[in-house]
Amino acid sequence: MPLGDCNISTPDNKQNRKNQEIRVPRVRVIGSDGEMVGVLSRDEALAKAEEEGLDLVEIQPQADPPVCKIMDFGKFKFEQQKKANEAKKKTKQVEIKELKFRPVTDEGDYQIKLRNMRRFLEEGDKVKVNIRFRGREMSHQELGREMAARIEADLGEDIVIESRPRLEGRQMVMMIAPKKKI
């Protein structure tokens, strides 16, 4: 018994019935060359598919009568899988990039981190800004708030602040996302 004829329940079997799984008495048949054959009984369509050494696959079960095509089911499944993989590749996963600052971060370092932040946002990633306080810096949290405000001002209108600066232990955290393009 060929593997394709097993009664294993897979998502593909649920979507496209083939050969003996088709239960309707009459079907509209499309030949293996893509030409319309016409409306045939299920048995005639199965005989025609078997004659060509191919499968009868139900393409549109909602149509009246259902549309079936004579094709190689294994190849059809492979093509569907390939299309699904291509669609999956095209979707970009949004990553969260983290940049760490100190309230006393030097101007050169600040500019480099700002440039990296812009690049991450242009690529569509979110940025987590982390301003870390050490020792007595905790008593000067206003420096951290000023740093967060400066970052927000320097990035301009191209961003959305997802979460305002908030204190978590010894660090101030702020989330920035790119503005959606319309």
UniProtKB/Swiss-Prot annotation:
This is Translation initiation factor IF-3. It is found in: Cytoplasm. HAMAP family: IF_3 (MF_00080). Residues 1-22 are annotated as: Disordered. The keyword Nucleotidyltransferase does not apply. The gene is infC. IF-3 binds to the 30S ribosomal subunit and shifts the equilibrium between 70S ribosomes and their 50S and 30S subunits in favor of the free subunits, thus enhancing the availability of 30S subunits on which protein synthesis initiation begins. The keyword ATP-binding does not apply. One of its GO terms (cellular component) is cytosol. Gene3D superfamilies: Translation initiation factor 3 (IF-3), C-terminal domain (3.30.110.10), Translation initiation factor 3 (IF-3), N-terminal domain (3.10.20.80). Belongs to the IF-3 family. SUPFAM superfamilies: Translation initiation factor IF3, C-terminal domain, Translation initiation factor IF3, N-terminal domain. PROSITE patterns: IF3.
